[in-house]
């Protein structure tokens, strides 16, 4: 199968530049605002969109993304509404890949077969489910592959040579390298070490390698872009949105403008870095 993710990374490889992968939480701070953010991301320079699935117990996420998940849940966001966001986005954009990211519990409650059917119909291209290891491929990974949806794995600095083949087995779309041990939003690791890790993983797979966790500024994104096929930015975008909300999580400023300003700066920095490196 060839998905929008495969097509996008092939296009970017031909252009000689990495992808900017942007994460935000579905329904944050409310459905209407979040959908406006989603539609604005590609125009600001996002190549791939990671659409967060709100969950009450996000064990891998730091305070910013935890709060970003609780705001939409408190406003009535459901997995069905997050899928609705993807479907509405697809009415205007049929090329930007959508990767839904989150935890297995909401999918399990929704029903795996029903979820995959609805995700495919909504234009979702890939899944990142952080609490499903490769030993549980039969739960969701293999059914997703059969449905034509990429299943994207996380690798970390502690993924050793014995574990790596298991992580890569049945992976598709791209590999998400977590730049450090810890939760989302923590400090970025040494970029030289990130480069070493990416080169090591590439010995075992032809899939693109995207690096995330801790990338907050255009300068950090540029540094990572010299080593990776893609740079993932999440917490910084979530914080940009949160900065336009009042203490109750309601819109007081312009979350869409704040998010797009940041993404535009990130995109310019990422693209310029690779162009400079290629000259």
From Swiss-Prot:
- List the active site: 50, 61
Under SUPFAM superfamilies, the record lists: Ribulose-phoshate binding barrel (SSF51366)
Q: Which Gene3D superfamilies match?
A: Aldolase class I
Q: Does the keyword RNA-binding apply?
A: no
GO cellular component, as recorded: cytosol
Q: Name one GO molecular function term.
A: tryptophan synthase activity
EC number(s)? 4.2.1.20
Catalytic activity as recorded in UniProt: (1S,2R)-1-C-(indol-3-yl)glycerol 3-phosphate + L-serine = D-glyceraldehyde 3-phosphate + L-tryptophan + H2O
Q: Which Pfam families match?
A: Trp_syntA (PF00290)
Q: In which pathway does it act?
A: Amino-acid biosynthesis; L-tryptophan biosynthesis; L-tryptophan from chorismate: step 5/5
Q: Which UniProt keywords apply?
A: Amino-acid biosynthesis, Aromatic amino acid biosynthesis, Lyase, Tryptophan biosynthesis
Quote the function comment for this protein: The alpha subunit is responsible for the aldol cleavage of indoleglycerol phosphate to indole and glyceraldehyde 3-phosphate.
Tell me the subunit arrangement.
Tetramer of two alpha and two beta chains.
Family according to the record: Belongs to the TrpA family.
NCBIfam families assigned: trpA
Record-given protein name: Tryptophan synthase alpha chain
Organism equals Brucella ovis (strain ATCC 25840 / 63/290 / NCTC 10512)
């Amino acid at each position: 199968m060839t998905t929008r993710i495969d097509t996008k990374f092939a296009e970017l490889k031909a252009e000689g530049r990495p992808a900017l992968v942007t994460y935000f939480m579905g329904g944050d701070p409310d459905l209407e605002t979040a959908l406006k953010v989603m539609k604005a991301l590609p125009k600001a320079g996002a190549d791939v969109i990671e659409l967060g699935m709100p969950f009450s117990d996000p064990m891998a996420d730091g305070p910013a993304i935890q709060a970003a998940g609780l705001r939409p849940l408190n406003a009535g966001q459901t997995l069905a509404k997050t899928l609705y966001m993807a479907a509405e986005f697809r009415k205007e954009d049929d090329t930007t890949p959508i990767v839904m990211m989150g935890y297995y519990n909401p999918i399990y409650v929704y029903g795996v077969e029903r979820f995959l059917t609805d995700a495919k119909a909504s234009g979702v291209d890939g899944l990142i489910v952080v609490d499903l290891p490769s030993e549980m491929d039969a739960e969701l990974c293999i059914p997703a592959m059969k449905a034509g949806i990429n299943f994207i794995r996380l690798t970390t600095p502690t993924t050793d040579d014995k574990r790596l083949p298991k992580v890569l087995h049945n992976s598709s779309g791209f590999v998400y390298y977590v730049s450090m041990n810890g939760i989302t939003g923590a400090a970025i690791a040494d970029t030289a070490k990130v480069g070493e890790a990416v080169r090591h993983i590439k010995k075992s797979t032809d899939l693109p390698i995207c690096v995330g966790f801790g990338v907050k500024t255009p300068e950090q994104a540029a540094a990572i872009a010299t080593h990776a096929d893609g740079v993932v930015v999440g917490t910084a975008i979530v914080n940009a949105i949160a900065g336009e909300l009042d203490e109750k999580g309601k819109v007081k400023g312009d979350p869409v403008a704040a998010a797009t300003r940041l993404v535009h700066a990130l995109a310019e920095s990422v693209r310029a870095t690779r162009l400079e490196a290629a000259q």
